[in-house]
C-alpha cells in the first residue's frame, strides 16, 4: 500500500505544530504524530553542570515508543481516519511527524517523502519562547544556556543529511507557510499517484 510521510522539523516555537495541524485539517486521510508527546518524565531527564534539565536532546525522548507509533501507522495507515477518508480522491494515507529532533534520529531517515524545517532567528525565537508556559517552567538563562545552543548543535549535525529538506522561514505568516507546504505536498501526491 502506498503511504506518504511528511517530516516537519525545526527550532523550538518555530510553528511546527501549527503547520502540522493546518495540513491535517486540509489533507484527506491524514494523521499526525508529535515528538513532544514522547518526552520522558522529568525524573528521567539529565541535568547539566549549570543545573539545566536537558530536554533538548534525543535522550530526553522515548524515541523507541515514538518509533513504535510510527511503525503501527505504517502497518495500518488508514486506521485513524475512518472509511470515508480511505475512499478520498487522494487515496494515499498521509502521516505527518512533527518535532524538533526528527532529522537527527537515524531510524527515521528512510521514511520521509517530504521534509520541511522551520527556522526562526534568535531574537524572535527567544521572544516566542518567553510567551509559552512550560512544565516544568524554563529557569532564568535556560534559553541562552541550553535551548539555543542545542538548536545550533543539532542544526549543524543536519549538514550531513543526504535527502532534500525544504527550509522554511518561520517568521512568515501561518497562512503563507501552510499554502507553500500544502501546494508542495499536493504536487508530490499527484506525482506519486501518476496524475
UniProtKB/Swiss-Prot annotation:
GO terms for cellular component: cytosol. The keyword Metal-binding applies. The active site is at 36 (proton acceptor). The keyword Glycoprotein does not apply. Catalyzes the phosphorylation of nicotinamide riboside (NR) and nicotinic acid riboside (NaR) to form nicotinamide mononucleotide (NMN) and nicotinic acid mononucleotide (NaMN). Gene3D superfamilies: P-loop containing nucleotide triphosphate hydrolases (3.40.50.300). Substrate binds at residues 36-39, 55-56, 129, 134-135. ATP binds at residues 10-18, 128, 132-134, 172-174. Monomer. This is Nicotinamide riboside kinase 1. It is an enzyme of class 2 (transferase). It comes from Mus musculus (Mouse). Pathway: Cofactor biosynthesis; NAD(+) biosynthesis. Pfam families: AAA_18. InterPro entries: P-loop_NTPase. Keywords: ATP-binding, Kinase, Magnesium, Metal-binding, Nucleotide-binding, Pyridine nucleotide biosynthesis, Transferase. One of its GO terms (biological process) is NADP biosynthetic process.
